[in-house]
Amino acid sequence: MVKIKYFGILKPCMPQTEDDGYWHAEKAGVTIGQVLEETEVVGKVENMVILVNKVRKPTDYVLQAGDTMTVMPLVAGG
């Protein structure tokens, strides 16, 4: 089981959430990129920060059981 949470404008892309605000998904063995494609996050924002267990990871990282994945869009101002 992997806990996944999207923030900001990406939050509506989460298929479901539990009471703790996370999507609990059977995604062990799947890459971050595959999760993003499945939930149609790809193309929603140009840049995002992806953390797994509070450490930044690339989209080819393979998720493990017990991981917590957090996805946040980068915000710019001027």
Predicted features, each with a name:
Residues 1-77:
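Ubiquitin-like/PB1-type beta-grasp interaction modules and other compact soluble beta-rich domains
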